[in-house]
A protein has these predicted regions:
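Short, surface-exposed coil-to-beta transition loops
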Residues: 36-39, 87, 111-115, 129, ...
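Edge beta-strand at a domain terminus
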Residues: 125, 132-150
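Central antiparallel beta-sheet cores of small beta-barrel/beta-sandwich binding domains
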Residues: 28, 43-107, 113-115
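Residue-level recognition of beta-strand termini and adjacent short loop/turns
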Residues: 96, 122-124
Length: 150
């Protein structure tokens, strides 16, 4: 009897982690914020999730006709880095119940980084909540998946 229980536990334990990874990986894909100005590809690196800008509605600065750069970044050493390819979502971990936490979101329009929580409301919709201090004092933006999952 002990052998059967031990074998059952050994086989059930890895399955739990495989299912959790599969559920967490639903976040992967290309997403568009509500303003339609960019598209962000969310990827998994190790056991964390990151999002980088892969498309811009206006990729070039109208004044220079050069690719838009991170001009408002508080770190002067990266102000000439192109926005396309910039990692704006960092360090998210899956916490269960279709929610990713402990990450940050960078807003290139004002050069600020905020704590962030991502909640998947359905297979093709994310509520991205950026905040300073406590989550209740933040702002939520709705992102839509571009590669629609059924």
């Amino acid at each position: 009897m002990k052998t059967i229980l031990l074998l059952s536990a050994l086989f059930a334990f890895p399955t739990f982690y495989v299912n959790q990874d599969t559920e967490a990986d639903r976040l992967l894909g290309v997403w568009e914020p509500s303003n339609g100005k960019a598209r962000v590809k969310i990827e998994k690196i190790g056991n964390k999730y990151y999002g980088k800008i892969v498309w811009l509605k206006e990729p070039n600065d109208p004044a220079t006709n050069q690719p838009k750069v991170d001009a408002k970044n508080p770190d002067a050493s990266v102000r000439n880095v192109p926005l396309k390819g910039y990692r704006m979502l960092k360090d998210f971990t899956y916490s269960g119940s279709s929610q990713w936490e402990n990450g940050t979101i960078y807003d290139p329009e004002n050069g600020s980084t905020y704590k962030c929580v991502i909640k998947m409301t359905d297979a093709n919709t994310l509520d991205i909540r950026g905040y300073i201090g406590i989550e209740a004092l933040g702002r939520t933006d709705v992102w839509k998946r571009l590669e629609v999952k059924k």
